[in-house]
Amino acid sequence: MKIIVSIKQVPDTSGKVAVNPDGTLNRASMQTITNPDDMNALEAALKIKDATGCKVTVVTMGPPPAAGMLREALAMGADEAYLVSAREFGGSDTYATSQILAAALSTLGVEKDDIVMCGRQAIDGDTAQVGPQIAEKLHLPQITYAAEITKNGDEVTVKRMLEDGYMTIKVQTPCLLTCIKELNEPRYMSVGGVFEAYGKPLTTLGYEDLKDDPLIDATTIGLKGSPTNIFKSFTPPQKGVGMMLEGDGKETCEKLAGILAAKHII
């Protein structure tokens, strides 16, 4: 049995977001992190590994520098990693990305007892589409918004978050799950894990490795094969600075009334 976890390197949106003159994100000038929801998916896989001894494989699609993120996943406890990277894959939207990742997972083999895990969504797009699209292309049953996961043999029980509560679903493996932050608290890398990470396999899968898969076609991958594209990204205008009024209730009310009167609001 193995668990394949799809992770993504994303811009750290907690810092300043840089935008190019053409409206696209200037990713080169921004710090990158592992997508937070993907970290929860990885932690869920590692917990099952701790309990069962299964193998955990991490996969990402991205440029060569994303290998550093994969090393971090290996340091956390994953057993092997695959970087799916090629110029032909550049500019892919969620549809094209899911085509490529599904082909990569098909190459690795998704067998009877296996589970595929993804984060709910990536913070750079917030679409929550890639995981379900991979499941559709690989003909896997899927459960999204997993807040609790229990595996018993070839059956997985998932507590799925809804807008106003939860529902419990049972599914047979192989299956795909998307995970949310409420699922767990990701572990930290250990010093020993960092050293061990460089002894674990990290393999690059390029276009030549995947081109024979029926999902890989020039019309369905990369920028040209993407039905959607980002027209423009922009930072919203900065809001006005807030004002703090100090004093007792009567005093602050008088100050506020004076300010509103000066602005002809009252």
Model-derived features with residue positions:
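N-terminal glycine-rich FAD/FM-binding segment characteristic of electron-transfer flavoproteins
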Residues: 1-266
